[in-house]
Amino acid sequence: MSNNTLNSLRKQLTFDFMLDFTVELTSEEVALLTLFENLDYSGFGTRLGRKGKIEPFRMMLLLIHGAMNGRTSSRELERHVERDLFMKAVFGTDVHIDHSTISRFISRNQEQIEDIFRQSVEKLASLGELGKKVVFQDGTKIESRAGRYTFVWKSATEKNMEKCLSRIRSLLREAVDADLAQTDEASFKEPEKPLASAVSAIDEKGLFNPSEKKGRGHHKSRINRLREKAVEELSKLEMQRKHLSMMDGRNSLSRTDTDATFMRMKEDHMHNGQLKPAYNIQNAVDSNYIIASSISSDRADYRTAGHILAKLDKLPWKYGIYCADSGYDCLESFQELEKREIEAYIKPQDWEISKTRSYRSDIGRSANMTYVEKDDCFICKNGKRLTFSGLRTSRRNSRPARVYECHRGCISCQHRQQCIKNHRKVRYKRFEVQLEHQKRQRIAHELLSTSFGAEVRANRSIQVEGRFAFQKQQFGLRRFSSFGKARVFSEWLVCCMATNTAQLAARIEQGKVGTPFWYRIKASPAEETA
């Protein structure tokens, strides 16, 4: 806000607008108070053990109401308290909140904010707004606050570290020749320790001359050059090892936000598949309300189902049906659902292409061959047996895939060109398959093919994808304004609570509170007459 009295001797007048009149609450404010007024805020504490000046309930109202109005930064929230009538009524006229107070509240109460989110979901259930039968999951990638070109790649760091160790070994040999270090062959496996000792010996003996002239026409002494290069290489090695320790199973990170991972985004401003530092956000939705959320560094969605299901386990009720798109079609997702006795309505990866005639008539696919469970082999169209030959591991699946091969009869087969795609280079038919995964895929395909399965698929697109669209378009949340996974997740949970509040406000205006949302597909006239 501009300061209009900065260069003026006559100061601007201040008027007190807190007159004696009442303002009717909007539906958003009614929904906000309904959801968060009687929750348990005892988990919020202070570092010094004394009661804070501002109640956590009021601070949560500020965060959520600010997010509903597109204000997420601490300075914007500070101005929001001063300018908004509802916030004036919540905090009073004599309370001033500094932006640092808001920032500290978010940083120190990350677990408590997640607990308030869980309590608000239970409050929605008590209002009759949740169906408690079907849960939908989907994910998105949201860009981090980190710079786009602050990448650190794991493979490049490992190569540079090997080169750095080689240079350190060379410097260590120079130190040994100058009688500054005494080493054996075993010391060259970890050369940084004896080289650091050599640098300390140079400093202790006073051999380093920091006032030595530099520039054109001046040559550094051997000791000065050795020490400067050693300090430089040791600092590089320390930084490279620090980066590798922070990878934690990832292949990249950002220097300015080490929790962010570089991913390929749909919002590509250069239209060339550029990688950006981002977080993988997952939402679980029931009746158009976000009931659980998680954050991870996974670049794909197939390993994130377990995180959401663990969050759903904390709710006092259990879901019987789980629905997700083909990005979650993996054996781990099915196994996690079977542990919890949840029916899996996961769209198979070949759902769309399986409807085509060419896919169903492809004789080279394992699904179109006959499997003999007794002999553990497949029978192709020519009647030849493809027997088990071994296992093959992959990054995507925790369990290895089974490899089947046909060792005779493929060269002279009349169907060779249709069965083997690369028939000019490959002599025999060979494919990989996960029988357990394939069996679960068939069950999910049958469930989704029913009339109820069609409704579940339609509701998945409407509900969970609609919530992401609302958060990105209505709230403008396309890039986080905080650093670190914990702080970013707190910011996201506040946005989720604001989304649920806006949805409840719309339901209050429509007079539909107590009837969970479910889109039903209208029957065709032929089905109605039948």
Per-segment meaning from a language model:
Residues 85:
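An anion-engaging/catalytic patch
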Residues 18-22, 35-36, 40, 153, ...:
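Short, solvent-exposed coil/turn linker segments
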